[in-house]
Amino acid sequence: MQKSKPQEMNGKGKIYAAIDTNVLVSSLFSSDGTSNPSKVINAVLKGIITPLYNSEIIEEYRDVLSRAKFRFRPELVDSLVSVFVEYGIDTPRTSVENEYFPDIDDIVFYEVAMSVDDAYLVTGNLKHFPKKCFVVTPSQMVEILDKRGVPSITD
């Protein structure tokens, strides 16, 4: 996987995002790379989105993407996770209180996103997170990229 250096889009600054594992899974299942989850991952690969992570997120990526039911090639999983580690930012969690999470394993993504000003959390499962403007679907992230004048991210 080729990865570009982070870019700034039309002077609007870098885009930082914690990316939920379901977005990676969905992108790897997209055969033509034009799905919104694929566009989000392509934006990471092109340096348009800087991923935020911590050791728990990386561990979850490896665990979930390596499950036999998905049949993803180990070298593809290693390559994708390596891009997140090499070009992302290892980010501490910001503890949150008084928020409800139906799946406690998702809290780490929320807390990592909360640790960086103006960061997003990109997920295919909005119902797993509090309703906040920074918690967005892959489709919404693609719209954000379009509004910032990001060149094609499907290549």
Predicted regions and their residues:
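Short, well-structured N-terminal submotif of metal-dependent ribonuclease cores
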Residues: 1-51
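Short secondary-structure boundary segments
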Residues: 21, 55, 124-126
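Residues that scaffold the ATP/ADP-binding catalytic core of kinase and kinase-like folds
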Residues: 26-28, 64, 132, 144-145
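PIN-domain endoribonuclease scaffold, especially VapC-family toxins
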Residues: 42-96
